[in-house]
Amino acid sequence: MKQHRIIASLPQKATGETIFAYDTETQGLDATQVLIVCCENVSTGEQSTFLDASEFRAYLEGNAPCVAYAHNGSAFDVFGIISKDELYAAPKIASGTKVFEYEVNGVKYRDTKHLLPLRLSQVARSVSMEKGETPQEYIDGTVTEITQEAIDYCLL
């Protein structure tokens, strides 16, 4: 019979970093063509909307040190916030080609897909919510006006 040994360990102390959840809506499927960024302070529930990715980045950096989570963020959202060159040079936590975290100017950009390896619609259903439908013009890349409906979708 095999024996296993379990060693107890205490949880790490909280870092005190503010945690944000964010999402981007883009013109088509081009991550660099950000039209809307919505974020929520996980601790306070305060929501913010930005129509300029550089303003969002400045907001996060103004709250540094902090952690910003996006679902599929390492493969999409972060590329609309930080340039490829900056990401390449940034300290990162990775395993092979999977990047778990980029750190830029005191902001740790993390991907929730590594914590919840599901499609966003599956995550929503698991907590009895609906993901909602991406407005078609955002998929097609034909957005001509930012509507409240699109902002509400981004904040879901």
Regions found by a protein language model. Give the residues of each.
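Conserved DEDDh/DEDDy metal-dependent 3′-5′ exonuclease domain
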Residues: 19, 38-146, 156
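Short acidic, Gly/Ser-rich segments with clustered Asp/Glu that frequently serve as metal-coordination loops
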Residues: 24-31
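Flexible, low-complexity linker/tail segments at the boundary of structured domains
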Residues: 150-154
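N-terminal accessory regions of nucleic-acid-interacting proteins
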Residues: 1-20, 24
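Extended non-globular scaffold/tether segments
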Residues: 32-37
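Intrinsically disordered, low-complexity regulatory regions enriched in Ser/Pro/Gly/Thr
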Residues: 13-14, 31, 62
